[in-house]
Regions:
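Flexible, acidic/Gly-rich N-terminal and inter-domain linker regions that tether
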Residues: 1-46, 354-363
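Glycine-rich, proline-tolerant flexible connector loops at the mouths of alpha/beta enzymes
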Residues: 4-5, 31-37, 58, 86-98, ...
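Active-site cofactor/substrate anionic-group-binding motifs, chiefly glycine-
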Residues: 22-79
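Mobile, glycine- and charge-enriched loop segments
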Residues: 28-29, 44, 50-54, 59, ...
């Protein structure tokens, strides 16, 4: 906690940068070309920070993509040099294992070279509940249908005090970790995430990182576990959470950054860019058993994302051909010129860009 709270950013950056070069010795920074496709916006979880979802009782707002909708999206992605769909959606009350197996198989039949980085622990837990299966059985069947890797979606902060208020219908912290543990025991490659800057404390951020580190220590020998960690600040614009705060209707003990309970905390004196950089740096230091740290530039902008390459990050993520969920809550940093813009930012930061696949191998 002292490092996070008190150490000057320049000193913290130097420590994290040294750790980065221990994991990735070369002065190179990876990136990926993929497409984020949200297959449905129907969701039971009703997260207080999400502007994208609609409730099952809102048919006028609901959508689910038809299979034919995927084909032009895949074609456009391939034309831009991409090879992977980041496929995510809501916790749809009617979609069990059969629906996902059918979708995955049809996608792989239509485009055999396509990589599916799909769903996340909340969806896996939801499918298990709907289909009355174990987490392991769901993962085994989805892998057989075409699932390649499992994103770290839905982690937010792995502390149940936070989760019960923000997203009470989502899996608990332990359930999220249990899904990932099963994926790791199956030898799957996954990622881990953290969304900060809402009702959590700095201590809870550290506890989140420690929980990830402990799970990574438990992965079977020779398996990747978490290949990468990604963090970003929550986008509050227009969310139910911000509306509750503005109306003075947050429960006792629940505060947002900048409110009275935070004023004694050094983080409320950090500029948003410094808070992001400090969080990336502390993640690099805590997660010494995770190979890669990604600079999630979508919510902080490309300039700040590139600065993160000097505080422990070694990957710039995707060019983001399509993104809906975070953008619906206020993020507006999608690239207009795609790969060239991202490569230029990496080079300007003093690194050599290289295009990777989902397993951090050159393409």
């Amino acid at each position: 906690m002292r490092l996070y709270r008190e150490v000057p950013l320049e000193e913290l950056s130097g420590m994290a940068d040294a750790e980065r070069f221990r994991h990735v010795p070369e002065r190179r920074v990876s990136y990926q070309i993929d497409r984020n496709v949200n297959y449905t916006n129907v969701c039971l979880s009703a997260c207080k920070f999400c502007n994208f979802h609609c409730r099952p009782d809102q048919p006028e707002k609901a959508y689910t993509l038809d299979f034919e909708d995927y084909l032009p999206k895949i074609a456009e992605m391939k034309a831009l040099g991409g090879d992977q769909l980041l496929l995510q959606g809501g916790l749809h009350p009617k979609y069990g294992i059969d629906w996902y197996e059918t979708l995955f198989r049809r996608l792989k039949e239509a485009e055999p070279s396509l990589k599916l980085n799909a769903l996340g622990p909340p969806e896996i837990a939801h499918i298990a509940r709907v289909s009355k299966l174990s987490y392991r059985d769901v993962l085994v069947r989805l892998r057989a249908a075409g699932l390649d890797t499992l994103p770290g979606a839905g982690a937010e902060i792995l502390v149940d005090r936070v989760r019960k208020f923000l997203s009470p219908a989502k899996p608990t912290a332990q359930q999220w970790l249990d899904v990932m543990g099963e994926a790791h025991r199956l030898g799957m490659s996954t990622t881990a995430t953290m969304v900060y800057g809402h009702i959590e404390t700095l201590e809870e951020r550290i506890n989140h990182l420690l929980a990830l580190r402990a799970l990574q220590d438990c992965r079977p020998a020779g398996t990747p576990g978490f290949r990468a960690f990604i963090c970003w600040p929550m986008q509050l614009t227009g969310t139910e959470l911000l509306r509750l705060a503005d109306a003075g209707r947050l429960p006792a003990g629940i505060t947002l950054p900048g409110e009275p309970a935070w004023q004694a905390d050094p983080s409320c004196r950090w500029r948003p860019d410094e808070e992001f950089l400090r969080t990336v740096a502390i993640a690099r230091l805590v997660l010494d058993n995770v190979d890669h740290i990604q600079a999630s530039w979508l919510t902080v902008g490309l300039d700040t994302g590139a600065r993160a390459l000097h505080v422990g990050a070694d990957d710039m993520g995707s060019i983001m051909i399509e993104e809906n969920v975070v953008s619906a809550a206020g993020a507006r940093h999608l690239l207009q010129e795609g790969e060239r813009t991202l490569r230029t930012a990496i080079e300007a930061a003093g690194f050599t860009p290289w295009l990777r696949d989902q397993c951090y191998q050159p393409r």
